[in-house]
Amino acid sequence: VTFVEGGPMKYSLIEGDALANK
């Protein structure tokens, strides 16, 4: 699990990539 700066939100690597590509 990776932590995204700006909040305690937790994203999996796949979810993080999907959000970053939006």
UniProtKB/Swiss-Prot annotation:
Family, per entry: Belongs to the BetVI family.
Descriptive protein name: Pathogenesis-related protein
Source organism (scientific name): Capsicum annuum var. annuum
Taxonomic path: Eukaryota, Viridiplantae, Streptophyta, Embryophyta, Tracheophyta
